[in-house]
UniProtKB/Swiss-Prot annotation:
Highest classification ranks of the organism: Viruses, Varidnaviria, Bamfordvirae, Nucleocytoviricota, Megaviricetes
Subcellular location: Membrane
Residue spans crossing the bilayer: 9-29, 79-99
Top-level taxon: Viruses
Keyword set, alphabetical order: Membrane, Transmembrane, Transmembrane helix
Cellular component aspect of the GO annotation: membrane
Bilayer disposition of the protein: Multi-pass membrane protein
Membership in a protein family: Belongs to the fatty acid desaturase CarF family.
Full protein name: Probable fatty acid desaturase MIMI_L630
Alphabetized InterPro entries for the sequence: Fatty_acid_desaturase_CarF, Lipid_desat
Natural source organism: Acanthamoeba polyphaga mimivirus (APMV)
Length: 200
């Protein structure tokens, strides 16, 4: 009985931490490579990431419900087969929940205390959700640290081992592609979301 409880607890902790690492890799790729003008993925994935660096609080325009549904849909597309093969394990369920919540957790880091739900502020203060101060480090140009948006813990470990710079050096060695090779200029244009139009 005790061993079963310990096993489930370890699975939950690992799922919690791995979900943050997975989202960190995803955000690192979006922030480091490609552009808002890359065919197919530019408009669907990269554009929003670049816009967020220019207008960080634009994320507040989206409801919690919409953010959760959008994240849950794409998460289920790849974690669904794992549920089928391995069952609803505590590890996989925790990963699914935390990745589905990642955009909302990220949104809360851009809100001040009276804007976010009290329960979210409490979870930030007890170290379960990432806080504003922890996420703020990512928004210091050139946006090359603290890519993991969920927990207060994973970024610390990854920055200590300098993971992102090592990965970037490896990618450049293999492909010749430099990280953040071009920062795209923009102009204010009310016809575009958040009033920002990127210049190619």
């Amino acid at each position: 009985m005790l061993l079963t409880i310990i096993d489930k607890f370890i699975q939950i902790v690992l799922g919690y931490l791995l979900s943050d690492f997975i989202m960190g890799i995803y955000h690192w790729i979006k922030d480091t490579y490609f552009s808002p003008f890359t065919p197919i993925i530019g408009k669907t994935f990269i554009w929003g990431s670049r816009l967020h660096h220019v207008r960080p609080r634009y994320v507040l325009e989206f409801t919690d419900k919409d953010l959760i549904i959008d994240s849950a849909k794409w998460t289920l597309s790849w974690i669904g087969p794992l549920f089928f093969w391995f069952g609803l394990t505590p590890f996989l369920v925790t990963m699914f929940i935390m990745i589905s919540l990642n955009d909302v957790i990220h949104k809360y880091t851009h809100e001040i205390d009276h804007e976010r739900p009290m329960w979210a502020t409490i979870l930030q203060r007890i170290g379960f959700f990432q806080s504003h101060d922890e996420h703020h480090l990512h928004h210091i140009a050139p946006h090359e640290i603290n890519y993991c948006p969920v927990t207060p813990y994973v970024n610390i470990w990854l920055e200590k081992i300098n993971l992102w710079r090592k990965l970037e050096s490896f990618v450049e060695y293999l492909t010749g592609v430099k990280p953040r090779a071009k920062e795209y200029e923009f102009v204010e244009d009310e016809k575009y979301p958040a009033g920002i139009r990127f210049l190619e």
